[in-house]
C-alpha cells in the first residue's frame, strides 16, 4: 500500500471531514477495498431477498393537470399509499434539469481546499454547508456520500454566499420548481378538504426551502456500505432530481421490502416528508428510503426540501380535527423536530415517532 494512502487510512476522519477531501477524495485515490469506517452492519445493507423487482412507485403525467381532476386524485392516492411518486410533463424545462446536474459535478470536481471553504468549520454562514456522510460525529459507520447544502433566504444572500460553481443553476432549478410545488401542495390540501391556503398554512407548507447537491463516488465493495441510510425526510415535500445511474430505494408501505425508483429522463421524484405526515394527521405517508453505493459509476442527485419555517408549530391541521378526527400527533416546534433529526445517525422513522401522541 502506498505510504500516502496508508497515512490517509490511519486517520480517515481528518482527511475526509476536517481537510475537506470528502469521500470523493478517498475514491480518487483508487481504493481497492472499502475502509472499515464505512462498513455498515448487515441489517443496514440492502439484499436481493428484500427487494421487489417487478414493482415501483407511481409515475404521474401532469400534462392534463389543469383540465383533468383525476390528476389531483392520483397525486393524493400516491401520497397515501406510497409516499413517493414520479412526475413527468411537469413544466420544468429539460435544460434546467441538465444544467443543475452539470453544476453539481462542477462543484464536486473543485479542489478540496476550495470546497472546504464551505465546511462547518469554515463557512461564514450556517445556511451554506459542505460536508460528508450525514452526522460523522454520531455515526458508528459512515455513509458513502458528500453533499453541499444551501438554505435559501434570499437571492441577495445566495449571490454573496453560495459557491459560484453552482449558484446560478441551483437558483434557476429552485425557481422553476416553485409553481410545481405550489400546485402539488394545493392538490394535496384539497385531498384533505382544506380549500384555502392562507398565510399561516403557506408558511407551514412551504415557508422555507433548502437545496442539496449530493455526490456518491464509485465505491469499492459497494455491497458493504450505503450511500444514504434508512430515513424519512423532515420536510413537507421533497422534490428530487436524480441522474441516470439509479440506486434510490423506497420501503413499501407496511412491509420490510424495498422497491427501486428507476431513473426516467426528465422526471422529478416527489416524496412526502414527516412535516406533511404530521400536518395530515397520518393520511399522507412519509416513507423510509435509502441509497445504495455503486461499484461502477459516480452518482449525483439534487433534492429541494420544502419545509415549514423553523419557528412554526407543526401538528394536525385544525380542519381535520374539526371534522372529528382524533389527533395522532402532538404540536411540535419545527426547529426542535429538525434538531432531533440531525443530532443522530439515520435511523428510519424514529424521528416522526418523536411527535406521536403516546
From Swiss-Prot:
Biological or metabolic pathway of the protein: Phenylpropanoid metabolism
Cofactor(s) it depends on: L-ascorbate; Fe(2+)
Pfam families xrefs: 2OG-FeII_Oxy, DIOX_N
Keyword Iron: yes
UniProt binding sites for 2-oxoglutarate: 216, 299, 301
Keywords: Dioxygenase, Iron, Metal-binding, Oxidoreductase
Domain Fe2OG dioxygenase: 200-308
Record-listed Fe cation binding positions: 231, 233, 289
The EC number(s) this enzyme carries: 1.14.11.61
Keyword Oxidoreductase assigned: yes
Cofactor annotation comment: Binds 1 Fe(2+) ion per subunit.
UniProt GO BP: coumarin biosynthetic process; phenylpropanoid biosynthetic process; response to fungus; response to molecule of fungal origin
Root EC class: oxidoreductase
SUPFAM superfamilies xrefs: Clavaminate synthase-like (SSF51197)
Induction (free text): Transiently induced at low levels by fungal (F.oxysporum f.sp. batatas O-17) and chitosan treatments, in association with the accumulation of umbelliferone and its glucoside (skimmin) in the tubers.
Tissue: Mostly expressed in tubers, and, at low levels, in underground stems, stems, leaves and petioles.
Reaction catalysis annotation: (E)-feruloyl-CoA + 2-oxoglutarate + O2 = (E)-6-hydroxyferuloyl-CoA + succinate + CO2
GO molecular-function terms, A-Z: 2-oxoglutarate-dependent dioxygenase activity; metal ion binding
Comment on pH dependence: Optimum pH is 6.5.
Function according to Swiss-Prot or TrEMBL: 2-oxoglutarate (OG)- and Fe(II)-dependent dioxygenase (2OGD) involved in scopoletin biosynthesis. Converts feruloyl CoA into 6'-hydroxyferuloyl CoA, and, at low efficiency, caffeoyl-CoA into 6'-hydroxycaffeate, but has no activity with p-coumaroyl-CoA.
Family: Belongs to the iron/ascorbate-dependent oxidoreductase family.
Name this protein carries in UniProt: Feruloyl CoA ortho-hydroxylase F6H1-3
Organism: Ipomoea batatas (Sweet potato)
